[in-house]
Swiss-Prot record:
InterPro entries: DUF3798. It comes from the Bacteria. This is Uncharacterized protein TP_0014. It comes from Treponema pallidum (strain Nichols).
Length: 202
């Protein structure tokens, strides 16, 4: 596996970034191949990138159900249940013959983290915390707000120092591959060799 970092010029702005994605996605796929898995760290640009990948038979990991719906032209109501939107997204993926090319987080990490952490704090304040291990207790609280999604909370390692940070955690959820299956991310052990990788400050 090889990793490549592609960066949009900072001065582009939102519209400029979208135009940049539109003109460069075909080049990226041509250069790195159709089996290149894209991952976008900027929420603002993810739908634009996914639209391009949908039209060019590309691959993307890390989108959410709403990103997919917008990129595929699936309409939904603001108060609609996510499971109903996901069903229509799956149908659109099958229709466009893109099964297995997009990995999504079925539950919104921002939504679940906000409610899960609030529930965790409430249990502490009201003396209702049953689990002594913070990681198990957090996973249990997150599960209340994410039907059908499994969570795993693990120690966080600072990649600059290689040391565990006691008041931070890493949070994982399983990833659903549209039209196929779920990747059991929460069952995986993080290989020790990757903990030795160091990232310098930019």
């Amino acid at each position: 596996m090889r990793l490549r970092r592609l960066q949009i010029p900072q001065e582009s702005g939102v519209e400029g970034a979208r135009a940049f994605i539109g003109t460069h996605t075909k080049q990226w796929i041509g250069k790195y191949g159709k089996n290149t898995m894209f991952f976008c760290t900027n929420d603002t640009h993810r739908v634009s990138l996914m639209r391009e990948l949908v039209s060019k038979d590309g691959m993307l990991l890390g989108a959410n159900v709403f990103d997919c719906a917008e990129a595929l032209g699936v309409e939904y109501a603001d108060d609609e249940d996510v499971s109903g939107i996901l069903e229509r997204v799956e149908s659109a993926v099958e229709e466009k013959r893109l099964v297995g090319r997009f990995g999504v987080n079925v539950s919104s990490h921002i939504f679940v983290s906000t409610l899960g952490l609030t529930e965790y704090a409430r249990r502490i304040l009201q003396n209702e915390l049953r689990e002594k291990d913070m990681r198990v207790a957090l996973s249990d609280a997150f599960s209340l707000f994410s039907k059908g999604t499994r969570w795993r909370v693990a120690p966080y390692t600072d990649l600059l120092t290689g040391k565990e940070v006691s008041n931070h955690v890493s949070v994982f959820s399983d990833i659903h591959i549209l039209g196929k299956f779920s990747l059991p991310v929460t069952d995986q052990e993080f290989p020790e060799k990757y903990r030795s990788i160091r990232f310098g400050r930019q």
